[in-house]
Amino acid sequence: MARISNAIGINPPIVIAVVGATGTGKSELSLALAEQIGGEIINADSMQFYRGMDIGTAKLTLAERRGIPHHLLDTLEIAEEASVARYQEQAREAIEDIQSRGLHPILVGGSGLYLRAALDVLEFPGTDPQLRRRLESELADSDIAKFRDRLRLVDSISEKRIGDEKRLVRALEVYELTGRPFSSFMPQREYVQPTFQIGLNGDRAGLHERLARRVHSMVEAGLPEEVAGLALRGLSDGKTASRALGYLQFLRTMSEPDYSRGQAAEDTIIATRQFARRQITWFTADPRVQWLDYASPELPALAKEMLSRF
């Protein structure tokens, strides 16, 4: 179907986000919407930033994109670390560019904080490597309980939320740099500009079965071979990429002879289901998301109808 600019009569074009758990069909719905209402797609899956991580992230091939431009795919090498702040800048640039051509930007993905960074009012405090090194040294010479007491005096909210040393140091770094609690920089549920979020959810048991089939399909499509090739390019050194679902598990098969591909696949299924539950918790906590059943045969039409009432 040919894309028609502003086909739902909203002017200027609004930002649309298709959100939800992995495996719910977000990519297919975003393609249908882009074709029907006139849009281009912006990736909001942090693991699809990585070049070469294709099968295990369910990244659409060029043919599967059906001629619709996709932004912010393949932006990082596997050893690079993803940055929410950098993504915010890139996503907002892409949004502005798409809207300037009379089309709707359609963000699609399940990386909740990245989506919030693109859509909502969210500040990122600066960093000071020298200050961070000093704080890390102080922590090494002290103990975490004393550091927690120190943070509690200036930011009790963050102290209660933070469970690891890295974020504890970061919270104190931000306070010393800005004089503001780290918790004051947390995202507010306030859109930067008019936005409509469509969430996909539905039968949990059905989703679990779908995720299992998806992992087995990825293995059959060559996920183990993809991981082996990326290992030669330094996948194990990538702090973010090496933790991706499927990639973490199949990397183990290369270093642990007793850890089989079959076990890696089963562990990937378990980890993917756990991740999906966390995504559902994240997105259902946002009252602005308008939900649809991912299994509905009328999904594109229902989504378009919702948008027409915006």
Curated annotation (Swiss-Prot):
Region Interaction with substrate tRNA: start-end pairs: 45-48
Residues the record lists as binding substrate: 22-27
Signal peptide coordinates: none
HAMAP family in UniProt: IPP_trans
One MF annotation (Gene Ontology) recorded for this entry: tRNA dimethylallyltransferase activity
Binding site for ATP: 20-27
Organism this protein belongs to: Renibacterium salmoninarum (strain ATCC 33209 / DSM 20767 / JCM 11484 / NBRC 15589 / NCIMB 2235)
Catalytic activity: adenosine(37) in tRNA + dimethylallyl diphosphate = N(6)-dimethylallyladenosine(37) in tRNA + diphosphate
Site feature: Interaction with substrate tRNA: 111, 132
GO terms, biological process: tRNA modification
Documented EC number(s): 2.5.1.75
The protein, known as: tRNA dimethylallyltransferase
Family named by the database record: Belongs to the IPP transferase family.
UniProt function note: Catalyzes the transfer of a dimethylallyl group onto the adenine at position 37 in tRNAs that read codons beginning with uridine, leading to the formation of N6-(dimethylallyl)adenosine (i(6)A).
Subunit structure: Monomer.
Protein keywords: ATP-binding, Magnesium, Nucleotide-binding, Transferase, tRNA processing
Cofactor: Mg(2+)
